[in-house]
């Protein structure tokens, strides 16, 4: 009997999740895995060296011509020669329907990164996600609380829970961001969207007593479509610096090793990519107490939790962190060991 053949599809948005997992499975699973990376025409996400083939789209996601591109893709890779299709790609238009048609009776395992709708989701995205859950039958969930939610809402579906792995971006190879090592350095990292509550974090920093503000610094690093709004909110506060841009992958290790805490003030999340990067680089977090964080953060051991959307509580936690005699009193050296225990 030959090896099982797996077609593994990863979109740019989930490349940071799969880039450490798929090469490991290729080496140790005993299965033949062909890995396909799907990229937008203007993507800056690098191609992983273990990827079998990269497919760059010429049209935007809602353009009906995307249907023809999906047809071309599935014909080119011979989708029906596989035993299992693992889909780590998400659009809000045609992908699932074309994949379902071409796959026929082949198992499609959908990587369900988000199950419970975020407050910032559009109606189209809500409809599309619900459609995938309704018509597909096999799913992977990445956090315990979303797995429990999924089991209750979709009791007839087949699912398995495999926690999101810690994420490595290699060794430090850049020196582009200057930090004052005499201060407590805080990092907000990733695309800035409404549910991540950067506004709350900025208010918290500005609300600290001046003598504490003088001893801390927040760097905000990531793409932002509404940068001017946050620059106005910061209003010249010298304890906050902004880098509103796409952070190159080669710079990520530098950022996560130069700071003392990763800030995760989100109001809702299933799981967080930056959170898993932080744990790889032994960087503790200050996070809201939503379930997506509470199942991984042990308060005072690998980070601190504060009450969701509570400015007063966030200020208090930042004050607590600023008063540590030795930042390493939060057990950095055990962060990856703690994550390993969850897997």
Predicted feature locations:
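Conserved small/polar residues in nucleotide/adenosyl-binding loops
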Residues: 333-342
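Short hydrophobic beta-strand element within catalytic cores of glycosyltransferases
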Residues: 284-287
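Short His-centered aromatic/hydrophobic patch
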Residues: 87-94, 112-115
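Donor nucleotide-sugar binding/catalytic pocket of nucleotide-sugar-dependent glycosyltransferases
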Residues: 136-172
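Conserved donor-binding/catalytic core segment of Leloir-type glycosyltransferases
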Residues: 178-196, 202-205, 219
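Glycosyltransferase donor-sugar binding loop
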Residues: 38-41, 189, 216-229, 245
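Conserved acidic donor-binding segment of nucleotide-sugar-dependent glycosyltransferases
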Residues: 299-300, 304-311, 318-326
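Nucleotide-activated donor-binding/catalytic signature segment of Leloir-type glycosyltransferases, i.e.
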Residues: 230-250
């Amino acid at each position: 009997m030959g090896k099982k053949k797996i077609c593994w599809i990863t979109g740019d948005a989930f490349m940071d999740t799969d880039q450490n997992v798929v090469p490991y499975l290729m080496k140790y699973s005993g299965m033949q895995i062909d890995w396909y990376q799907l990229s937008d025409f203007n993507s800056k996400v690098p191609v992983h060296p273990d990827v079998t083939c990269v497919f760059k789209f010429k049209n935007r996601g809602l353009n009906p011509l995307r249907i023809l591109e999906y047809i071309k893709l599935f014909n080119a890779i011979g989708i029906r020669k596989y035993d299992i299709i693992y889909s780590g790609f998400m659009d809000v238009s045609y992908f699932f329907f074309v994949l379902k048609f071409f796959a026929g009776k082949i198992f499609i395992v959908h990587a369900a990164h988000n199950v419970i709708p975020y407050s910032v989701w559009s109606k189209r995205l809500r409809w599309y996600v619900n459609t995938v859950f309704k018509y597909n039958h096999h799913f992977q969930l990445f956090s315990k609380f979303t797995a429990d939610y999924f089991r209750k809402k979709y009791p007839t579906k087949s699912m398995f829970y495999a926690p999101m792995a810690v994420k490595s971006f290699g060794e430090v190879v850049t020196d582009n961001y200057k930090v004052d090592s005499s201060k407590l350095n805080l990092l907000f990292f990733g695309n800035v969207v409404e549910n991540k509550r950067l506004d709350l974090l900025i208010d918290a920093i500005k609300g600290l007593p001046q003598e504490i503000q003088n001893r801390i610094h927040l760097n905000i690093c990531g793409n932002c479509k509404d940068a001017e709004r946050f620059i106005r909110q910061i209003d010249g506060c010298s304890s906050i610096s902004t880098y509103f841009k796409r952070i190159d992958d080669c710079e990520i290790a530098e950022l996560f090793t130069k700071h003392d805490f990763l800030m995760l003030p989100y109001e809702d999340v299933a799981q967080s990519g930056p959170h898993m990067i932080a744990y790889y680089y032994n960087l503790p977090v200050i996070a809201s107490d939503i379930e997506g964080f509470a199942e991984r953060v042990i308060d005072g051991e690998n980070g601190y939790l504060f009450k969701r959307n509570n400015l007063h509580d966030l200020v208090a936690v930042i004050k607590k962190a600023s008063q540590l005699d030795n930042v390493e009193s939060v057990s950095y050296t055990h962060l990856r060991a703690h994550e390993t225990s969850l897997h």
